[in-house]
Amino acid sequence: MRSHCISKKIAHGGRINAAQVLFPNAPAPWIDLSTGVNPCAYPIPEIVPQAWSRLPDDEAFSSIEDAARIRYNAPLQTRVVAGAGVQSFIQILPRIFPRRRVGILGFTYAEYALTWGASDSVVEIVDTIEQLDKDFDVGIIVNPNNPDGRLVEKGQIAKLAERFAQRNQQLIIDESFIDFYPQFSAVNLTLLDSVIVLRSFGKTYGLPGLRLGFALCSKHNENLLRQALGPWAVSGPALAIGLKALSDPEWINLAAVQCQQDAGRLDELLKDRKSTRLNSSHIPLS
């Protein structure tokens, strides 16, 4: 177990322009392997002019939130809150649950330690899920993990969530990369006040610039999240494109097969270069 607090800006992947400045003589075109974004993006549909010229209304939000609940196979009573990407929720969660002891299952996406540390919370990075089962006020699991793909079994998370509920603790589960492996998802736990599940839109659909993500939670947590986000938390064009994509099961099924095939091909290419596999991307699709 390690105490951890980050106070500096984090350098994320996907910064092709910065890389080109550092390595101006590198061969082109660049192949960006620095992010977990699907390189085969959902085709942008035609957007009605009103999506640009008007503020998004309540119906636009309720439509996409209903579509997300269905797409993620969440319980009917689960509340869904749309935001400008999962990062928007990461930024506000320390304000909703302030000055807490926060346990993070590491090594993982560093923005969690950064944002909670900046809120004067005491942050500890733990090495196993069992170490989260103690007197933390907030526990955070990224599942599958970013960046190494580590997966925590659904049953382990369910047991931990039950104990968090008994102790009135908060468990945050970031499922930004779980779309192709729904059998590992904890969305069935979102009726508990002690659980918030975060889901990314842009990564799987290859549209991170759209800035769209969702929190799945209980009614109590929905009220807290909406109050913290404020009105019009997502743009009209993002709501329109997201609704179209989430309502297109054929595309997501084909994308899952394509990504699995591409992952296998990449593994073979790297194996030919005598590279070492740190984690397997070959999990049977559900």
Which role does the model predict for each range below?
Residues 33, 171-172:
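Residue-level marker for buried hydrophobic side chains located in beta-strands
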Residues 194-271, 275:
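PLP-dependent aminotransferase class I/II
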Residues 16, 30, 61-65, 157, ...:
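A general structural signal for well-ordered alpha-helical segments in protein cores
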Residues 53-165, 172, 177-196:
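Conserved core of the PLP fold type I
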Residues 36-40, 87, 145-147, 178, ...:
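Short, solvent-exposed loop/turn segments at secondary-structure junctions
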Residues 272, 278-286:
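Single conserved hydrophobic/aromatic residue that forms the stacking wall/gate
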Residues 45, 111, 147-149, 205, ...:
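Short glycine-rich, flexible loops that bind phosphorylated cofactors or substrates
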Residues 1-60, 67:
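N-terminal "arm"/small-domain region of PLP-dependent enzymes with the aminotransferase-like
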